A protein has these predicted regions:
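Alpha-helical transmembrane segments and membrane-interface helix-loop junctions
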Residues: 1-168
Length: 168
């Protein structure tokens, strides 16, 4: 099981590091969009939509990377005072909750994504980016990766429980 958790962690780390480069691309596109709009009075719907096409993978894959590295949102004000045992309990409970939430989002988003792919959904804006269905397809994909990372966190926390019990 620990090998599975390690493999999941390595994959999520790889995806997260690759996705991080999209942040640079997003900043450049946004900067160019602002420069063109306010410096030259030239608006570009394509560039505005491209920002969303970059932001979606940053968010859906970034949340997995943040969970892996413990940078996700947590109420550290209280958590920092918990014993190690209670921290592990909270980590197991939240990881299981994360898996349940991921499964729900995947189940609810699949018909939405399927419909988008089946009609080859594009933009309604003239001059915008077609292939909106690709971005929508990242929703269940990102939550599947989040499910796997939550599973990895559950495995690691359960092994930490067992190791702590063996020491005591």
């Amino acid at each position: 099981m620990q090998r599975l958790a390690g493999a999941i962690d390595a994959f999520v780390d790889l995806v997260g590091r690759a996705t991080a480069w999209l942040t640079l691309g997003l900043a450049l596109v946004m900067g160019a969009n602002v420069l063109l709009r306010y410096g030259f009075s030239v608006g570009s719907i394509w560039m505005q939509e491209f920002e969303w096409h970059l932001l979606v993978p940053i968010c859906v894959f970034g949340m997995c990377y943040a969970l892996l590295h413990g940078e996700h949102v947590r109420v550290d004000v209280a958590f920092q005072y918990f014993s190690e045992r209670n921290k592990r309990r909270v980590n197991v409970a939240t990881a299981i909750l994360g898996m349940a939430l991921s499964a729900i989002v995947i189940k609810l988003s699949l018909p939405y994504v399927y419909q988008s792919w089946s009609i080859n959904e594009g933009t309604a804006n003239p001059g915008g980016i077609e292939h909106r269905y690709i971005v929508k397809g990242l929703i269940p994909l990102g939550f599947a990766l989040y499910f796997l990372q939550s599973l990895s966190e559950t495995i690691k926390s359960c092994f930490a429980f067992r190791s702590a019990r063996d020491v005591a």
